[in-house]
Design a protein with these regions (language model features):
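Iron-associated oxidoreductase/ferritin-like identity signal
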Residues: 1-176
């Protein structure tokens, strides 16, 4: 995996920059989940959209916790990390949302995103020299495992998907 970040000197990353990076990762994921939820609502797939809204809320809660830690440690000192430096760290791919998506399929999308985030933090840790930064990224890496376990428990509660996809029975679009 190539790290989806640009122009960051990882070995010399400060704790402030690491917290800013983590806040941005959660912000990006939250926004993507909201976009996918909007898309699925348009496609009349409310159960899957609802799960993506749940994930967006979780990402926002985590973002706020990290932002609070950052403010506590560094007050309002300016950030040197910005959104242009990251792309698709934890956010689901846009192509993941599909018409007639089931809740089980939505959970699988979220699971893949959490796996992607875990891999990101594992790779980051290999580059980091600063002990405080390494500790933060190790904490975030471990949280991604907890998120995967949460999703696995939710998947286990669901009935199996139907053997046939709903899209197989959909009418073709009508032209006028």
């Amino acid at each position: 995996m190539t790290l989806p970040i640009r122009t960051l000197d990882l070995p010399s990353l400060s704790l402030r920059d690491a917290l800013d990076l983590a806040v941005l990762v959660d912000e990006e994921a939250k926004e993507r989940y909201e976009e996918l939820a909007d898309q699925l609502e348009l496609h009349h797939t409310p159960e899957a959209a609802s799960f993506f809204r749940f994930m967006a809320n979780n990402e926002e809660k985590h973002r706020l916790e990290l932002a609070s830690r950052r403010r506590h440690l560094f007050a309002d000192s300016p950030s040197t990390v910005h959104r242009g430096m990251i792309f698709d760290v934890e956010a689901p791919d846009y192509s993941e949302a599909a018409i007639f998506m089931t809740p089980r399929q939505a959970l699988a999308v979220a699971r893949r995103s959490e796996e992607k985030a875990h891999g990101f933090f594992v790779e980051l840790l290999a580059e980091i020299k600063e002990p405080e930064v390494a500790a933060l990224f190790a904490e975030l890496r471990d949280e991604e495992i907890l998120h995967q376990e949460l999703i696995d428990r939710e998947i286990a509660k669901l009935p199996p998907d139907e053997p046939f996809a709903a899209a197989d029975f959909a009418d073709e679009p009508v032209s006028h």
